[in-house]
Every structure is written in C-alpha cells, then in structure tokens.
Amino acid sequence: MENEREKQVYLAKLSEQTERYDEMVEAMKKVAQLDVELTVEERNLVSVGYKNVIGARRASWRILSSIEQKEESKGNDENVKRLKNYRKRVEDELAKVCNDILSVIDKHLIPSSNAVESTVFFYKMKGDYYRYLAEFSSGAERKEAADQSLEAYKAAVAAAENGLAPTHPVRLGLALNFSVFYYEILNSPESACQLAKQAFDDAIAELDSLNEESYKDSTLIMQLLRDNLTLWTSDLNEEGDERTKGADEPQDEN
C-alpha cells in the first residue's frame, strides 16, 4: 500500500509541476481510495489539483455568461442560442468535476479523517464544491446544492470551533469561503459581514499566539476577510452591485 501511495503522490507532484491537473486529480483519487488519513501535503495536492481543474471551467462560465448578457442586450438571438449551447457544455463539465470530488470526499476522505484539521478541511471542501454547483444551477437544483453546501460548512464550523485556534489557517479559510457563500449564493450580505467580522476579530484577539509556521498563511487570509468586509460594507451602505473580491482563498492556500 505504501509503495502505491508514494508512487501516486509522486505522480501528482509531477503533474502539478507540468500543469497536467486532470492527471494530478486522478493520482490523488487513487491515494484517497486507499482509505488512509491524508497528510497535510497530500490534502493540499488534492485541493490544488481539483481547484485548477474546476477553476479554468468556472472562469470560462463567467466569461460566457457575460458575453451572453451583452448579446441578449443587442438582440442577437442567433448568437445567444450558440452561447447557451456552449455554456451548457461548460456547465456539464463543471457538474462532472464537482460530483467527482464530492463522491471522493463522502466515500473516502471524510470517513478516513480522524484529526480535527482533516475533518474541517474536507467538510469545507465539500461546502466549496456544492457552492460551485450552486453558482451555475437554477431552481430546485440550485436550492439542493445550496442546502448541501450550507450543511457541509456548518459541520466544518462545528469541528473547527472545537479543535482549531481562531488563527489557524484552515479555520480562517473556512470563514472566508463560508462568508462568500452567504454573500453570493444566499444573497445575505449581513450574514456574510457578521461571519467574516467575527472570524477576523477572533483571530486578531489571539494574534500573539500565532506560530511562525502558519503566520504568512493566516495573515493573508485575514487580509482577504478584511478586503471583503470593506467591499460588502460599502455595498450595504450604497446598495451597490459590485462583485466580491478575493472570493476564495488564493490558490497557494489550498
């Protein structure tokens, strides 16, 4: 088992270096299927691989949606039809990636997690990928994805509050993404601000106890929390429609 694990982790690292992210996630899926608790490095390889696979498609979807709106405003019906078909292809790819990692999380990664940090990490990841599903879904499908995302984030919060310091980068990253979920998916800027402010204030109160190893990661996420708070507070005051900055952790945080 160890030889297989080492082999797949090595292949995943090679795939990352060569930016072959589809192969990276396949290698890490094989590690997950061994049903062992992943190391911090292995967790991050899973996260980075899927983040890149999904990230490119999320960017494509946003661009297509923007172009589609412009074509609709111009009354270019034929182009709108083409765009809808193209967007549907991207949405099918997005759904496939999300459902793939969500299955791995439910069947292997969460059941194999004994450490609090691992449990929080993978429930947060579950919340993230249901959130990505909710981004492009509508009607009952969107509600189902949003409900599943909310439950996963809540499970992550419950575990984090019992076992991780407020300054821990995994707990801070959870607060960042959960607050974005409230803002973008549930359209609740008040809840988003409340969650982000609480996480930021709790971390500030314990900043002196922050260890050197995670100082850079933690302060980076705290900065993103503060940036979002500034933007969202401005939106609340001015009833603006500006989009969220720093909606997720930077890639090197995953």
UniProtKB/Swiss-Prot annotation:
A GO biological-process term: brassinosteroid mediated signaling pathway
Kindly indicate whether the keyword Nucleus belongs to this entry: yes
Say which domain of life the source belongs to: Eukaryota
List GO molecular-function terms, semicolon-separated: ATP binding
Q: Which GO terms describe its cellular component?
A: cytosol; mitochondrion; nucleus; plasmodesma
Asked if ATP-binding is a keyword of the record, the answer is no
Q: Where in the cell is it found?
A: Nucleus; Cytoplasm
Q: What is its main location?
A: nucleus
InterPro entries xref list: 14-3-3 (IPR000308), 14-3-3_CS (IPR023409), 14-3-3_dom_sf (IPR036815), 14-3-3_domain (IPR023410)
Describe, as the record does, how this protein assembles with itself and its partners.
Interacts with DREB1A and DREB1B in the nucleus. Interacts with CINV1.
Family note: Belongs to the 14-3-3 family.
Q: What does this protein do?
A: Is associated with a DNA binding complex that binds to the G box, a well-characterized cis-acting DNA regulatory element found in plant genes.
What name does UniProt use for this protein? 14-3-3-like protein GF14 epsilon
